[in-house]
Amino acid sequence: PSTLSPAPCTLHKTRQDSPFRPGRRGGAIPAEENVIIPNIPDDKVEAILAEPLLKTYVPNPGPIMSGLVSCTGSQFCGLAIVETKANGVKLAKELEATMNIPNEVRMHWTGCPNTCGQVQVADVGFMGAMAKDAAGKPTPGVNVFLGGRIGHDSHLGEQITDKPVAIEGDLLPFVQNLLVEKFGASML
């Protein structure tokens, strides 16, 4: 059997020592808030991969999309300063389309300082804040955090921006440079 974990997700063969081995029931939603569907019979994998839902929640996401986490953002939260989900997905797609990124980079978005998106434990975290555009007008932006880790060598990431970076126009090149300098990425 195989295990499918969409949104962002990965499809892989189940090993004998896996907690998702045959005979085990149910799915799982791990801390990263992905969905894992275990025990898919091999003869059903292709049919499941053809499901319309998996056009949006792809089974083999790229190195940014696979580690993307977001709070609900301003779409559903009155405390959020910025829209997190749409901006996170847009940035992930732009980065993956313009860069060679050798390893997964966990990026977390949170719309406000309450940090429901847990930006301080991400490789790169984005906390919603108001920035200024090129004309000096207020625009949605983010404070950027770097270096958070969970697990054995856990520690909180640190804010690396002195002032918020405007999401439109400034954030993409800022993060591209960050990925080149800190994560071994290169431009395509």
Label for each model-derived stretch:
Residues S2-T139:
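Small-residue-enriched alpha-helical segments and adjacent helix-cap loops
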Residues P1, Q120-M187:
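Mobile "lid/hinge" segments at catalytic clefts and subdomain interfaces of large enzymes
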